[in-house]
Amino acid sequence: MSDPTASPLIWRDDGMPQSALYGDVYFSSADGLAETRAVFLAGCDLPAAWAGRDHFTVGELGFGTGLNIAALLDLWRREKAPHSMQGGQRLHIFSIEAHPITRDEAARALAVWPELGEAASVLLDHWPGLARGFHRIDLPGFDATFDLAVMDVEPALAAWDGAADAWFLDGFSPALNPAMWREEILAAVAARSAPGARAATFTVAGAVRRGLSAAGFQVDRRPGFGRKKQRLEAVAPGVAASPPRPRRLAVIGGGIAGAAMARAARAEGLEAMMFDDGQAPASGNPAALVTPALDAGGGPRAALPAQAFARAAALYEALPEAVIARGALKLSVVPRDEARHAAVADQDLFEPGTMAVLDAATATARLGEPVGEALSMSQALVVEPARVLDAWRGEVIDAQVARLAHEDGVWRLLGSDDQLLAEVDAVVLAGGAGQARLWPDAPLRPIRGQTSWTDRPLAFPTPAAFGGYVAPTRDGMLFGATHDRDDVGTDARAEDDRRNLRALAEGLPKLAASLADAPLRGRAAVRATTADHLPVAGAVPGAAPGLFVLGGLGGRGFCLAPLLAEHLAARILALPSPLPRPLSALVEPGRFSSRVATGAV
């Protein structure tokens, strides 16, 4: 396996960044920013092309140093329409980079153009990592969302479900990197283009002209920049359109799924109303351990929790005082765990070095009692649920939605006495195991779980997982949890506290012994899972348009909910999802449709 930390970039004597793989420069030695503005921004008729559009999507082949995106953001912030009572314009950016560079390398490259100012700063402050897959990047203050695909161009285009209004075709020279300019790639670009989309590139190579023409673009040569005599502009058939999109969303459920949904909806300009009847949400513990479900086999089932984990960690780190602790150890419990941990540590789905196998001596020193080998997850977090929910939920309407009715494109939320609670364009069911009231045939199974905690401080700073888990709270420690299928009781049970203590003794007997006389508090809640142990995030099958579900998160709600909520917000607004297609297929509620008799009521 190649070294994932090896830089694909070298610096020439004149200070220009050059690809170590292809031998080509990242941008023009004459003036890279001027070239970007002439070739890509003007070549795609920006800013005129986004005038009058609520949402505008730009795709790019070859993220490189981020110069094109920084220049685009600078132009967007200066030229987008101001906010109005109907909201404001939103920009979505999708770029592909098979060989990403580091934030420090990008900062050195972009420092040549201080005029990019805040646009370059926000990009560098949220610079994506090196893990393979899709990265959702926040660009605060720019009304923009950025998804970067760290993978080869062909699978990246196949995985993206968006349709770009403009394309920056900026790979290295066709002579040095011909694979990126193949006819199949340009056909895939066309397939991911909106009607009337424009594409621009610096090259006029015959293979590129023919490939764009064969894909259906009208191709024209234009005067080039600097020493290049010509460049290309291309226009896809059709006329650009701005279809009407939902404005008002109701979120039913006030736990982490609902809170994440409200945050994601508002980030995309939706007005989100939250309804919660306060019936023991599953997100009410004093601490939540945020770790991904691990799959040593790789593939989509491993990639989904890995991508969700990275996104969740970034969002929680941005919340003031939400993080209680960082890092966690997953102990080897059975002999096969050592091989599984080694396989996970070798996966490129996580940032390099963030999953590492520790020998028994090192793990023992970390935890203060004898343990075997362990997997160190340095980006794991312990968060305080109340701070996350308070930051994301917004105003909560204390009411039980007893029934939903759909008429003339409007969803009506009705209370227990059939009183009208709200009229909205779309509804998300995010009530966990309580979905059955509004979706009787939901493919969700209830699992009761009880956690236990004490005000005695945890002797070591590192959370640990061992079948059960233990994590610090603000003023003590939490451990657990029980898993009882088809039990919907939310009463705290002394026997379950004892079960949790016995499970703790199997993983960390010294710690468990120290708690033998400690007063324990327990809290029980009912979580929802599915037959295949994967969540559901999408349209409710069999229901009228505009009804969606986010659920089946099991015990991984704080890991999965933030990214899946962004995926669902994209589905609601017909925008590009942050999930690659193979991952979004895993969470489609319709995968159970053969067993679903009716939609929601």
Swiss-Prot record:
EC number: 2.1.1.61, 1.5.-.-
GO MF annotation terms: flavin adenine dinucleotide binding; oxidoreductase activity, acting on the CH-NH group of donors; tRNA (5-methylaminomethyl-2-thiouridylate)(34)-methyltransferase activity
GO CC aspect terms: cytoplasm
Kinase listed as a keyword: no
Region span, FAD-dependent cmnm(5)s(2)U34 oxidoreductase: 252-601
Signal peptide: none
One GO-annotated biological process of the protein: tRNA wobble base modification
Reaction equations catalysed: 5-aminomethyl-2-thiouridine(34) in tRNA + S-adenosyl-L-methionine = 5-methylaminomethyl-2-thiouridine(34) in tRNA + S-adenosyl-L-homocysteine + H(+)
InterPro entries named in the record: FAD-dep_OxRdtase, FAD/NAD-bd_sf, MnmC-like_methylTransf, SAM-dependent_MTases_sf, tRNA_MAMT_biosynth_bifunc_MnmC, tRNA_MNMC2, tRNA_S-uridine_synth_MnmC_C
Pfam families, alphabetized: DAO, Methyltransf_30
Cofactor: FAD
Region annotation tRNA (mnm(5)s(2)U34)-methyltransferase: where it falls in the sequence: 1-237
Subcellular locations according to the entry: Cytoplasm
Keyword annotations of the record: Cytoplasm, FAD, Flavoprotein, Methyltransferase, Multifunctional enzyme, Oxidoreductase, S-adenosyl-L-methionine, Transferase, tRNA processing
Keyword S-adenosyl-L-methionine listed: yes
Function text: Catalyzes the last two steps in the biosynthesis of 5-methylaminomethyl-2-thiouridine (mnm(5)s(2)U) at the wobble position (U34) in tRNA. Catalyzes the FAD-dependent demodification of cmnm(5)s(2)U34 to nm(5)s(2)U34, followed by the transfer of a methyl group from S-adenosyl-L-methionine to nm(5)s(2)U34, to form mnm(5)s(2)U34.
Family the UniProt entry places it in: In the N-terminal section; belongs to the methyltransferase superfamily. tRNA (mnm(5)s(2)U34)-methyltransferase family. In the C-terminal section; belongs to the DAO family.
Matches recorded under PANTHER family: SARCOSINE DEHYDROGENASE-RELATED, TRNA 5-METHYLAMINOMETHYL-2-THIOURIDINE BIOSYNTHESIS BIFUNCTIONAL PROTEIN MNMC
Protein name (Swiss-Prot/TrEMBL): tRNA 5-methylaminomethyl-2-thiouridine biosynthesis bifunctional protein MnmC
Gene: mnmC
